[in-house]
Amino acid sequence: MTTIESQCSIDGILLLNKPQGMTSNAALQKTKHLFGAKKAGHTGSLDPLATGMLPLCFGEATKICQYLLNADKSYETIGRLGIKTNTADCTGEVIFCIENYTVSHEEMIATLEKYKGKIKQIPSMFSALKHKGTPLYRLAREGIEIERKARDIVISQLNLEQFDGECFTLTVSCSKGTYIRNLVEDIGDTLKAGAHMTKLHRLYTAGFENNRMYTLDELQDMPLSQRLACLIPIDQAVQHLTPVILSDSEVTAIRQGKVISNKTGAVEGEDLRLYGEQSQFIGIGQALIHGDIKAKRLVSFAL
């Protein structure tokens, strides 16, 4: 394993393939150490049970973490009918068990159709959502249950990949804030058989569908120069935003906090990708009335 002598300024995004059994924060800290990065953050937790894509932002890339938090996600998951747990996954205690049930392939397909599109979902008590500053999972472990409001989510894709009458494999594309284990549990409830999630793998975060993920073992075996080559440019996380090219004088002005006049045709309040004349990424701007632009989140190393 290559060790890092001292921390350096590193800016970019790494797509980590998080291992099972590790918290997202532990994975972040291990990777941060491998890169010797001064500043790092992840873009939405994966449960310890889960594996798959965990985008990690280093340095100036932490300024665009929110865009990745808000991005759609795609997963592969396995559910098991007949058993419910208090956590809705295989790490919890069994609270319901039924042996005599029959679910046909057609019934499963028909049930999945009910969960496509815009739906409401009640978050699990075993989640990181907070009640008066305390994470719900801590309250749940103390036997305390808090009423949770159903939240609007969007399931844009829900495909049945395998089903043997007991275990079912799904691919799911969904909006932020979707709890896949609760989706699996809800599907089981609709089928009147109960269900819990046994596996969860995040396939990708929107915007990184075709990018490679790296495991911790792979990164550990690389020299630092090769690790750095794994980083993705910051602006790839915001490719869905409209790009705007600024002149040198406009770059200087917006860095000074001034509003610049740039007839973009963008809708007022729309976020924009800002570049200098040499195609260097400047950061995120926001469209104002009459096409003016103000700074929203600028990166500090752009010239």
UniProtKB/Swiss-Prot annotation:
It catalyses: uridine(55) in tRNA = pseudouridine(55) in tRNA. GO terms for molecular function: RNA binding; tRNA pseudouridine(55) synthase activity. Keywords: Isomerase, tRNA processing. CDD domains: PseudoU_synth_EcTruB (cd02573), PUA_TruB_bacterial (cd21152). SUPFAM superfamilies: Pseudouridine synthase, PUA domain-like. One of its GO terms (biological process) is tRNA pseudouridine synthesis. The active site is at D47. Responsible for synthesis of pseudouridine from uracil-55 in the psi GC loop of transfer RNAs. This is tRNA pseudouridine synthase B.
